[in-house]
């Protein structure tokens, strides 16, 4: 059993407990609700329900049970493992591979491959459906992803992400010629009120900060490096589209007619850096841009 403690602040007053947990940890809201239902969330000695309203002064204790026997079908999916030890795995995910099972994608995901590779040696923080997953990248985004092999490693890695101490750099090809050599996009992101499948810049969304540097200009296109300060769903895609420079090939936020006949956005998680949860060593990994991405650049 792993224990996580979160101190509420005045700004959290009135928030539902399950949302508060999800916003302040790497635990998903649905799993937070289940932990409440199962009696694993407390304030002092009192068990709390998911609909409990935060007062703004309390300390919330979350007891995360050890992994259940995984119900995910192990699948022998080839994994491009960049690094692995007893605590973490760094995997280079190809475009088109979902990170975890979801309706319509119950198998053939990165998690199915991880369960085959690791057995039950994956953290349980994110529940049975997302064992080991510390953070996610979209199905059609390629690149580096951190996986935790135990709860202690997961909590420490999640804390680094929350405190903005982990480094995540992406490379993207965007539409249009960005005039500035660098910039910062600081716009809150939340669900699109008119399309729940999409995210959008919304005034009451969660804080989202993306830094970008221009790497090369190609007339109608710009190659950029994007550095995440926060990690909201679709953050880079939404932010770049919000300044008029959507990612080439993006089916949700891009232009409708692309001339390159792509299967998804040209967005690659190129570099990731973090402090090892056990040794304290600073680790950094880099992944080359995939071939299909390079092929487009050669045509420009």
Regions found by a protein language model. Give the residues of each.
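RNA pseudouridine synthases
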Residues: 1-300
């Amino acid at each position: 059993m792993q224990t996580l403690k979160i101190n509420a602040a005045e700004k959290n007053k009135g928030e539902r407990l399950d949302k508060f947990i999800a916003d302040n940890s790497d635990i998903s809201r649905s799993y937070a609700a289940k932990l409440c239902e199962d009696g694993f969330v407390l304030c002092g000695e009192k068990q709390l329900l998911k609909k409990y309203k935060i007062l703004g002064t309390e300390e919330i204790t979350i007891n995360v049970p050890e992994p259940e026997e995984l119900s995910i079908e192990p699948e022998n999916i080839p994994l491009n493992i960049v690094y692995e030890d007893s605590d973490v795995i760094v995997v280079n995910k190809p475009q088109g591979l979902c990170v975890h099972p979801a309706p319509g994608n119950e198998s053939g995901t990165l998690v199915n491959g991880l369960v085959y590779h690791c057995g039950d040696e994956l953290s349980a923080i994110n529940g049975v459906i997302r064992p080991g997953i510390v953070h996610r990248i979209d199905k059609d985004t390629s690149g580096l992803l951190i996986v935790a092999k135990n709860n202690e490693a997961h909590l420490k890695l999640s804390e680094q992400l929350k405190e903005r101490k982990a480094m995540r750099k992406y490379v993207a090809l965007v539409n249009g010629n960005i005039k500035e050599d660098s910039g910062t996009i600081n716009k809150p992101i939340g669900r699109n009120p008119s399309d729940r499948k999409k995210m959008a810049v919304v005034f009451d969304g969660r804080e989202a900060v993306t830094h970008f540097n221009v790497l090369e200009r190609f007339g109608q296109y710009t190659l950029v490096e994007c550095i995440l300060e926060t990690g909201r769903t679709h953050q880079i895609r939404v932010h770049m589209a919000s300044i008029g420079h959507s990612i080439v090939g993006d089916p949700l936020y891009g232009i409708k007619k692309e001339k390159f006949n792509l299967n998804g956005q040209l967005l690659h998680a190129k570099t990731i850096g973090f402090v090892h949860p056990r040794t304290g060593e600073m680790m950094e990994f880099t992944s080359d841009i995939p071939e299909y991405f390079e092929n487009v650049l050669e045509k420009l």
